[in-house]
Amino acid sequence: MAAATSSSPISLTAKPSSKSPLPISRFSLPFSLTPQKDSSRLHRPLAISAVLNSPVNVAPPSPEKTDKNKTFVSRYAPDEPRKGADILVEALERQGVETVFAYPGGASMEIHQALTRSSTIRNVLPRHEQGGVFAAEGYARSSGKPGICIATSGPGATNLVSGLADAMLDSVPLVAITGQVPRRMIGTDAFQETPIVEVTRSITKHNYLVMDVDDIPRIVQEAFFLATSGRPGPVLVDVPKDIQQQLAIPNWDQPMRLPGYMSRLPQPPEVSQLGQIVRLISESKRPVLYVGGGSLNSSEELGRFVELTGIPVASTLMGLGSYPCNDELSLQMLGMHGTVYANYAVEHSDLLLAFGVRFDDRVTGKLEAFASRAKIVHIDIDSAEIGKNKTPHVSVCGDVKLALQGMNKVLENRAEELKLDFGVWRSELSEQKQKFPLSFKTFGEAIPPQYAIQILDELTEGKAIISTGVGQHQMWAAQFYKYRKPRQWLSSSGLGAMGFGLPAAIGASVANPDAIVVDIDGDGSFIMNVQELATIRVENLPVKILLLNNQHLGMVMQWEDRFYKANRAHTYLGDPARENEIFPNMLQFAGACGIPAARVTKKEELREAIQTMLDTPGPYLLDVICPHQEHVLPMIPSGGTFKDVITEGDGRTKY
């Protein structure tokens, strides 16, 4: 693929190649150092440090046209020089950015100074760069718009790594901007220098090291286009400090230079391909839909498709909410901790319609046995995913939304001819639902964590935006909260990054100020980014925290119980010297940040406690003490098959 810095420009309106899209990996855009051009007409000498370090005088606004046919009002005159940092911030404004999650440092100070001169961009100040990137993810996942995070060089930049990897695996549109040491110091092991472009090469869709201030408008435009087009993902822009300080007159009319990428973006699906899929549906007796994160933007079309066909829907962890979990045709989640009936449906299906999924190991278990009786149709926007893990019988590289629209038209036009009826199959699955419902046991006054989520679902009528950390609580939140719409469910699915839930809730609350946002968290995950309580308080965000506290690293402990004879290997998170006390005291963390908090230990008191949490204005933490013996069930052991499914037992049982 051509590099992003190719000399052959292509505009947004250029027609894509008429050829079939070639296989394309998200890793195929190499970074390059753009040579500094001789542009003395636009630049001021770097030596005038007195000018660079003085406040920038803002000229009267001048209207300029943007690419989106809206009038953008710049705070600078068209021919007025301004710092590279101000050009960067204005480039963000021109992309419609309203919020960034930025933590300052020496190499990014100029960017922060420029942000203070912006009247349209709000900075939500995290208390750790990882909190900032996870908050940007929460913003993006809940809104569908790209999330923006900014960090300084060195440790600030490396603190973004987990968030970038998470966004890459879960296809989240993210633009990360990092400060870098001045160009002359790059490669000298300067203070707080890390080669963040090299560090993040394999965990970003693309990244840039800006070597010419003139390139900032083009690079920012490309970064947003890359992050949001095709299969979304993170893009990193590394900006040396001297570039931020350099004075220049920006050229906002530069075209993007992405000819290779543009020519390989997927084409609209061919009608003949969609007709072939409809034919397979008409010939099947036991079809099932397997939908993932690639279907989140297609919920309306998916709903219509299910209405026209009557095919039951199983969802991945990423796909929760693309089809209402409370609908009778929903099988909820499939995979390792999916419902028995969802996994039964895949096991016994004769046609698997895989839309926007990647056949990952937590869904498939043993690949050879997964959907072994079924013909497989795979539709995905990333051709690298098709055939990567499971070879389909029919594949379409394209947008799931467009494919569903096309199939819906075919189905509507041929409804009388097709007369699809899968009633017998649906009855069989209904029997499985009755035989193997999601359930839990109650022991005395102890609070089952599943019950807490069930009550939250009832009291919020399934309308809350839910974020989670990673572990048992994450799986219970996936199972027992009935998501009605896409972008209600925010969770680190592919990477499984603990500490995600609290900052993600911050981003979701910023993006959706009128929504109920609840972080369902575990004590292990919560404490990994507990410092973000300060951000919640300072920003006065109405984030609710339902903390399922079992004093253990629950999911690892569950595996210890099942596969290691319950030998505890550093999974107890309390104080061994005071096992009868709750440690640490999460209420004191909340109190230190001025956030109301309460603890509940008895099942009979739980409903009222959750209602109080929801009714209290602003943020609130509810510490729900749960027994550590609970296991997430059902469970198919790693690498197992449907016949290996576990439906009984917990930490009170010996294995």
UniProtKB/Swiss-Prot annotation:
It catalyses: 2 pyruvate + H(+) = (2S)-2-acetolactate + CO2. The keyword Oxidoreductase does not apply. Residues 472-552 are annotated as: Thiamine pyrophosphate binding. Binds 1 Mg(2+) ion per subunit. Keywords: Amino-acid biosynthesis, Branched-chain amino acid biosynthesis, Chloroplast, FAD, Flavoprotein, Herbicide resistance, Magnesium, Metal-binding, Plastid, Thiamine pyrophosphate, Transferase, Transit peptide. One of its GO terms (biological process) is L-valine biosynthetic process. Its EC number is 2.2.1.6. GO terms for cellular component: chloroplast. GO terms for molecular function: acetolactate synthase activity; flavin adenine dinucleotide binding; magnesium ion binding; thiamine pyrophosphate binding. Thiamine diphosphate binds at residue 129. Residues 1-82 form a transit peptide. It comes from the Eukaryota. The keyword Magnesium applies. Residues 1-24 are annotated as: Disordered. Its cofactor is Mg(2+); thiamine diphosphate. Residues 1-20 have a biased composition (Polar residues). Belongs to the TPP enzyme family. Acetolactate synthase is the target enzyme for sulfonylurea and imidazolinone herbicides. This is Acetolactate synthase 1, chloroplastic. The lineage of its organism: Eukaryota, Viridiplantae, Streptophyta, Embryophyta, Tracheophyta.
